[in-house]
Amino acid sequence: MEYTPVYPEGIEREAYEAALEKCVISGGWLLNQSMLDVWFDIDGFVVKVPAGTRVRPDGWTLVRNLVSGMETEEFYGCTAPVNRCGFKFLSGHKLYIYNDLVVFSPDSARAQGGYIGPPGRTLEEHIALINTMKLQKATIIAGDLSFLPRCPSLRTVGIQFAQGLDRELDFSPLYQLPHLESLSIAAPNMGLTKGPAIRIDFTKLPGLRSVSVCTNDPYNYDQVPTLEQLWHSNDKRHRDLTDLSCSPVLKKLELLCCATKSLEGIGRFPLQWVSLSYLRGLEDISALSGCAETLRILNIDHCGRVKDFSCLQELVNLEYLILDGSQTLPDLRFLKKMPKLKFFTFSMTVEDGDLTPCLDIPYARCDKGKKHYNLKDKDLPKEHAGSGFHLI
């Protein structure tokens, strides 16, 4: 197979190429060891390889999260999803054989990239299956969402814009789903070119717990008091986190390629997982100390303007820590103040060259060795980092 990188329109090329350098092919797997989603043209199919995962370009595959160690069977658009009686599903797990139904609306809708293929059943048959089986999760290849009120059992909805869609979607049918808890909206045109604006009123989605959105369209998820997980990329409006959310239960925050300059306000949330990737304007992370009691996983990936990492020594409950970038850390002595840490990887330079603090961690990885280091990566512990990370 031929793997050709695809460059999304508007992406910061330096950051993207740095991410591509962390993609390797091993044992038939394509591993993305960066914290940035990348795209490849694989024998004519455009494939998204999510950050921190590995995929095998043969359709259904086991995807391993390189950060948490968790393994789940998912589909990332390599060839064809699992087909059962003409219906397509994005989970091949034998215990969840009806998980994540792919719904084409209208029947003529086609997935971007062409990897899912045409529907084997009509929209009406998809609606009937959802209601008969009381399905809770669906991914919609969307040109029209007007059918959603007829599927009240849905709790998790992923929306992918149909190929060639050049108009705004009407998201108001989502407001009539009584049990919606998780909503993911993929970037139009796979994020490769600018697409239609996304306009949605999150205040009309009571009970929403998880939101995943892309692009710089104005979102009011900050007014959702039940939000527990938030992933946002390309947000150019917020310079700090003071008005990020009104939710008192926000546990997981992932920001990618946003205009954030300071983490001021982050201490208001009981965050357990924070991922900061390619935030080129981010300069101050000192507010992380306000999350010391709850924070268990922290990823700082290519946020080049951050120079002061002294707040790390206050994060005594961390279990997973990833520090990637071109900055210099004075030393790694802060690791000794993290008794629960079981996973640490870094590519930043350690000024004093002493890597011995890594020896007390079950799993440690040095991605860029230096001549003045007193240990090489092969000398660092490589024990299993546990059963993976789960939000409490």
Where do the protein language model's features map onto the residues?
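Conserved acidic
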Residues: 1, 20, 28-31, 78
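Concave beta-strand-loop units of leucine-rich repeat
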Residues: 30, 35-128, 134-147, 153-173, ...
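Intrinsically disordered, low-structural-confidence terminal and linker regions
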Residues: 3-9, 32-34
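Long, solvent-exposed N-terminal ectodomains/accessory regions
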Residues: 9-16, 22-24
